[in-house]
């Protein structure tokens, strides 16, 4: 009996992470008094250079936690296509992470994998955690509605996406199942 209850609980929690329908993005219903922006953060590129995210002011950003050994890894191809097609509208930023135990061992391996298999040219950053107490500061901000004013959702798997407006404010969260080519996501980028 105890095993059945535990098995049902485990199955239910997995079902929440991998819903079969495409959930709508989370949009803000209330705003923090003074929400921060992603421009307040400095990150390290995949080759170790320090970058202030303020360098992307004036463009929408699609911030994605990525992994090389995931069922969603083929989304790299669509992310690259989106990055090229809407280069004047959005910049895709890829943040490799082993938070779900599906990333390669080093930044060098990740960069080589992305270039060889998907021709990735959009910016990739240092492999770092994206959830929990160990999450890198940017991802703590992205997941905390009291800080960003809009979204209170941490990545529950690889290839979750945060849309950031031209002023650096987080405006939407898209779970892994929402592909970069999803019409709703593309519409949000192009409006």
Residue ranges and their predicted role:
Residues 140, 144-191:
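Thiol-/selenol-based redox modules, centered on thioredoxin-like
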Residues 22-54, 136-137:
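N-terminal "domain-start" segment that seeds a small globular fold
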Residues 45, 65-69:
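Amphipathic alpha-helical repeat scaffolds
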Residues 4-12:
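Sec-dependent N-terminal signal peptides
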Residues 59-61, 69, 73-95, 114-118:
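Conserved helix-turn-beta segment immediately C-terminal to the redox Cys motif
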Residues 89-107, 121-132:
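Thiol-based oxidoreductase modules, predominantly thioredoxin-like and allied folds used
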Residues 109-158:
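Short, internal strand/loop/helix patches
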């Amino acid at each position: 009996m105890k095993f059945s209850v535990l098995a049902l609980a485990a199955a239910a929690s997995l079902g929440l992470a991998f819903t079969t329908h495409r959930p709508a993005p989370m949009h803000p219903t209330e705003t923090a008094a003074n929400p921060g922006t992603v421009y307040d953060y400095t990150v390290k590129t995949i080759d170790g250079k320090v970058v202030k995210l303020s360098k992307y002011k004036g463009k929408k950003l699609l911030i994605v936690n990525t992994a090389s050994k995931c069922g969603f890894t083929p989304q790299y191809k669509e992310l690259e296509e989106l990055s090229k097609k809407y280069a004047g509208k959005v910049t895709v930023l890829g943040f490799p992470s082993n938070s779900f135990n599906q990333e390669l061992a080093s930044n060098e391996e990740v960069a080589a994998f992305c270039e060889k298999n998907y021709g990735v040219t959009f910016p990739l950053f240092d492999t770092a955690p994206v959830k929990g107490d160990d999450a890198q500061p940017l991802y703590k901000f992205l997941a905390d509605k009291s800080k960003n004013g809009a979204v209170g959702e941490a990545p529950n798997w690889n290839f979750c996406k945060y849309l950031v407006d031209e002023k650096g404010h987080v405006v939407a969260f898209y779970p892994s199942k929402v592909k970069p080519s999803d019409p709703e996501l593309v519409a949000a980028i192009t409006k």
